[in-house]
């Protein structure tokens, strides 16, 4: 959980002074016990910090402003122990710039039927206070997640955990800098978009970075540094030397290691956590020059390994997917099955098991590999460098997962997710690349059709662990459209949803 160890979620309890000082003391004691219990549950990956009971508008405003100014705080949980008049929350909610979760719960699980009296009723008014708080949030159009359930319930805790991971991802997104090594692939529409609006709405900052400057880093990487990294490769991967021959194999692997070192150093020096490449922009040097120094191949191996470390990646200049993958990686830290950048490549029509092969030229993250990846070198005839090229080769784990993408529709961004089932492919002896084979849900015909109708991309950020609930929370926190495709999708209902959304997102701006 290293990604979360320096982060906090603040818990603010709502009450009022109407019920006297003794009630406030009890509210405070109960709140501390509940926060300690949630932290001890092991279900919530980010530490919850109790920030006291708010009994007035000034107290609410003070804690919300403090949350905004504390980089450790990624979100606020509110709970109304007693009745807390909602007008006292207006200024604080207007100030709040962090994600909000409203927890509708209660200190006691059951009503003490034999002893209940008006003192108990006045103190334990979550049923009353939370509805009042919910009303003002709805009236103010405050985006928030509402979790209803007993605080010791594992189901409620897991919903909080989802929100907490997403809040961490959103906080990270506001600090992401994505470097484009080269621009978007010419004439491709879906990987392009409005980078200014992207930063304004989602927080990601995208910059062009000259490949010539990257080459300056490459030239400074020593043979000794590259050889040291190659030794690491030997420990992690199965070495498989095929038609390239041993001399070419190790030369290409060594140069791939240099590319990885150079890329990592640039990203670190520039404070970047995401990047894109373009196979047609790998430097201007002539590879046939006897004194050539530079990228002699697409930096696919480097991209695969950097993705595993948490750097966002997008091929062909796809900065939206690079940024989204970074957020996906942050959200799923500590989860078991992994995530990757993937691309729809070719179809396999086989009745109920009709599927789409996911691959790329090289750049698939080994986190999703079912077995130990093989380090191979093969000819790649795409792009400016048509050369023998190093890459990790594997097939993905089987099982259900979610692919996600963000598209620019001109007047707004749309987040799309789709449930898929990764299945085992047949052997592909002449396709030495990493791959996944999946069946879109609910069927190929409906799933693929809905994705196309939504304007989905051919690139996606995929995870076995991150569910629709995460992406729904993510879109809500950022105020962007979200549509999901799953086992319950029908084309007619999905088309109607898209039509309604067109009107809603046009008119919704007038409500804020």
What spans do the regions from the language model cover?
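Anaerobic metallocofactor- and corrinoid-dependent redox/one-carbon enzyme cores
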Residues: 81, 98, 104, 112-113, ...
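Flexible loop/turn segments at secondary-structure boundaries
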Residues: 18-20, 57-58, 84-87, 109-110, ...
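Short catalytic helix/loop segments, enriched in acidic residues and glycine
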Residues: 25-41
């Amino acid at each position: 959980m290293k990604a979360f160890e320096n982060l906090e979620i603040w818990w603010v309890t709502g009450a009022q002074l109407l019920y006297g000082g003794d009630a406030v003391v009890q509210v405070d004691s109960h709140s501390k016990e509940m926060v300690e219990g949630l932290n001890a549950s092991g279900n919530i990956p980010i530490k919850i910090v109790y920030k006291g009971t708010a009994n007035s508008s000034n107290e609410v405003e003070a804690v919300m402003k403090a949350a905004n100014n504390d980089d450790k705080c990624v979100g606020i949980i509110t709970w109304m122990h007693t009745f807390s008049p909602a007008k006292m929350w207006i200024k604080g909610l207007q100030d709040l710039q962090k994600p909000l979760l409203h927890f509708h719960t209660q200190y006691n699980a059951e009503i003490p039927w034999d002893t209940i009296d008006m003192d108990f009723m006045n103190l334990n008014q979550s049923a009353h206070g939370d509805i009042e708080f919910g009303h003002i949030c709805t009236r103010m159009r405050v985006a928030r997640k509402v979790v209803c359930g007993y605080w010791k319930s594992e189901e409620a805790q897991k919903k909080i955990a989802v929100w907490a991971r997403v809040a961490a991802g959103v906080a990270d997104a506001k600090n992401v800098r994505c470097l484009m090594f080269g621009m978007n692939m010419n004439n491709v529409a879906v990987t392009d978009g409005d980078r200014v609006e992207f930063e304004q709405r989602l927080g990601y900052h995208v910059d062009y970075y000259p490949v010539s400057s990257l080459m300056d880093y490459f030239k400074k990487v020593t043979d000794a540094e590259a050889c040291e990294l190659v030794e690491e490769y030997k420990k992690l991967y199965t070495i498989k030397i095929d038609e390239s021959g041993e001399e070419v194999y190790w030369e290409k692997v060594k140069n791939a290691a240099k590319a990885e070192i150079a890329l990592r150093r640039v990203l670190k020096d520039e404070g970047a956590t995401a990047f894109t490449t373009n196979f047609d922009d790998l430097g201007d040097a002539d590879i046939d020059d006897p004194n050539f120094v530079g990228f002699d191949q697409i930096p696919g191996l480097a991209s695969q390994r950097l993705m595993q470390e948490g750097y966002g990646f997008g091929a062909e200049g796809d900065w939206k997917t690079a940024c989204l993958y970074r957020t996906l990686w942050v959200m799923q830290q500590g989860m078991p099955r992994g995530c990757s950048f993937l691309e729809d490549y070719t179809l396999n029509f086989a009745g109920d098991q009709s599927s789409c092969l996911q691959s790329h030229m090289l750049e698939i993250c080994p986190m999703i590999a079912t077995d130990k990846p093989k380090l191979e070198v093969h000819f790649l005839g795409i792009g400016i460098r048509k050369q023998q090229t190093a890459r990790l080769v594997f097939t993905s784990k089987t099982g259900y997962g979610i692919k996600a993408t963000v598209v620019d529709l001109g007047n707004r961004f749309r987040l799309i997710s789709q449930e898929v089932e990764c299945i085992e492919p047949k052997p592909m002896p002449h396709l030495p690349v990493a791959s996944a084979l999946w069946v879109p849900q609910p069927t190929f015909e409906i799933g693929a059709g809905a994705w196309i109708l939504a304007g989905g991309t051919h690139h996606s950020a995929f995870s076995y662990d991150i569910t629709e609930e995460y992406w729904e929370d993510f879109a809500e926190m950022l105020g962007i459209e979200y549509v999901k495709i799953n086992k319950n999708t029908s084309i007619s209902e999905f088309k109607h949803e898209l039509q309604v959304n067109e009107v809603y997102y046009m008119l919704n701006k007038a409500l804020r």
